[in-house]
Amino acid sequence: MKFTVNQKELLNNLLIVNKAVSNKNIQPLLSGIYLEATEDNKLIIRGTDMELGIESEVSAFVEESGKIVLPSKYFVEIVRKLPMMDLELSTEENSQIKIIYGSSEIKLNYFEGSEYPSIHDFEGECVLKIKGDDLVNAISLSQVVVSTDMSRPIFTGILLEIKNDKLNFVSSDTHRLCYTYIENIEKNVDRWESIVPAKSLKEVAYIIHEDEEIEIHITSNRILFKSGNIKVTSRLIEGKFVNYEQVIPKEFSTDINIIKKSLLDSLERAFVLTRDEIKSKLNTVKFNIKEKVLIISSRASEVGDIYEEIPIYLQGKEIELGFNGKYLIEILRNIDGEEISIKLNDPQSPGIIKGNQGNEKFIYLILPVRLQ
């Protein structure tokens, strides 16, 4: 195998593909990055941990085709530190690849590439086409309330559901739930449900080109994303997601509009006092909603108290209840827009947080906590 490739292009694509590689994998082959030089002057770069797979194509001048696997831990760092110039890579008979840059060279041991898992194109039973920026936004909103508890795997994923001409995204960590959606999608089915690992979607959001159309293929156990010269494939999570439509309240007795930054700043100040008591006190923040003001208070027994008033516009009843301040902070940091709406019923029932002023394509549901 012998080819010439630009250092910057090679590095950019290695950094993308390397997100699917685990250096802790007990199989040496899966701790590496697959390189294939093709006769039509392309360099195919691939990484996988058998759960997530990423493949990219780079233009190269190929003199001799071939395929090998290089240890990602060393290869990526070496390429990162090479000068920005054309690099010449060629395999030698002693299972080493020579990397020539200017008048210098580095040699690395490699594995044969014939046994490395492939990333097949497949025609999904469900095929979608959506805008890249819409997909990135939906993933960003959803992933903040995903569980890390592997004993309940469906909550470590995000539900992708086609229903009523929309692509719905639903996630939950059992304390909170997020619902958002994308309209104006091209699709070949009217109904579909799949649960995609949140960590896979996080990488998709990082990798894809936001200004491009994204093609998605889904089968019963895998999903494939195509964006420009990049393909990402992931296994799906087995199981049935919770009936989120039954969980989200439809009517409310209390509805407040509030400036998001004012609420977030206040909660972050309260968190400074209570963060060392999270495990024992659930980081509880009291909300006392009056006619024109939200009173936020919190107490840390060994640190002190906080009491703040924030102007609001209230429709409905006054109410007093508690929330986990950390959970609220994580949600608010993830919302764009100046103003939000918080809708409530009673101190034991879930409330919801929505955007205002045209930023209304999402709902966060959050459970209150019992006040001491």
Residue ranges and their predicted role:
Residues 1-372:
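Structural preference for solvent-exposed beta-strand-turn elements
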